[in-house]
Amino acid sequence: MEMQTNPEDQQAQLNRVESFGESLLRLRKEAIDARIASGIERIWLEDEEHYEGIDELNRGQERSAWASKPPGRSDPSRYQNRSIVFPNITRPYVDAAAAKIGDTLLPTDDKAWSLKPTPIPELMLIAEGNLPAPVQQGMEEVGVPPETQEQVAQIEAQEAARQIKEAKDRAAKAEQRIEDWHVECQFHAEMRRVIDDACKIGSGVIKGPVPALKRQQMFIDGMLVIKEEVKPISKRIDPWNFFPAAGCGDSIHNGSYCWERDYLTAKKLEELKSDPSYIASQIDLCIDEGPKKAGSIRKTTDGKDVDDKNLFEVWYFYGVADKEDLEAAGVEVPEGIRHIPAIVTFVNDRVVKAALSPLENGELPYDIFAYQRRVGAPWGTGVSRQIRTPQEMVTAGVRTMLTNAGRAAGPMMVFKNNVIPADGTNDITPWKVYYASDDDATDDARKLISLIQFPDLQGSLMNIVQFGMKLAEDVTGL
């Protein structure tokens, strides 16, 4: 960014940039608060837990971040003397759905799309030698000889055929170019990650196409040549790091803006100063301040909290900005435009870069793939949520069955008061010796100890498990 040389003008410019940033930060707070209020973050966390096979009872057995009890959850330590296994049917159903969608939309070594020119009925008729009726009628009215009419029809047919062929050739070349871009940016790999997110938590976020600088190294005539090109790419965005506009409804494109969160180390942030489009003085202030956090807790793709206290939060705003604000941030804005789509980058709530949107119409370069749409929300419902009730039924049935099996594995023993173990303990061991009092009237030792067998209910409990498995198939369609 080019700063003013006059100190007063320079300070005024920075003040304008700071004011510009504060106005956008209010929109960020609205977006963050709206997503929290929607309850979708709690749903994501619950869906991630079931995918990982974690719930209240077995949380303490997990050797990971899941072991910490989230707010509002019961303490697992109070559940004793019962089975805590988690028969995870959520993960295979989620993975099966993702594989099925991926194989359908992203076939291996092929593409699931093609480009063809739009058909023009009039042009197709002319290519077959049939002139439009008004043209044919006009030539007859002015007395054009039939031979001349035939020549005109042939010439027009040749021209129409040429245009049709040219359109097909252009479509084929455009298709090849787009496919080349997809291969270079690993579009299939990124989309499979988006599909995984959608099947797991209901929503997958894809960003693109957006311009990105690609560097290629090659040897030409024995010399190393480094070539830099700007090419369109698409990439997957973690749903935890995407914040659509508050009140956008069921489509993020109904909102006027959106925010994306990313993270940078201090080293990477320092390297941005070499880019003249960044405001170096603002970056220096950010590094001096240290990392600050503005959003909700960062999660990994499996929902665990991330230790990112040494990382700087980077926020990208996509929306409409005023001409004067962009010019204060060093952006050259065309004349005659007062409001223009822009991209503004924040670090530590400071504007470090502003640029015009590469899309002239201002369309947001994001899309949310919802596995099953929710009414009035851009987020979707995933397989993990669809199968939640069957998963709980299967889990409860298996745990009760195993608890029952453990209790039915051995009998309950009832001793009369005058029966005393020789070793002073009630442990059941071979060659155990007991003493019976001489005062006891019976001479049959078996009457001094009674065995009660706990009922084995595995058959009836397995019916509950089987019903849960059948219900899982019905609710998912898999």
Indicate residue ranges for each PLM-predicted region.
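Extended, helix-rich architectural segments
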Residues: 1-352, 457-460, 464-467
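Extended, charged amphipathic alpha-helical segments
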Residues: 312-478
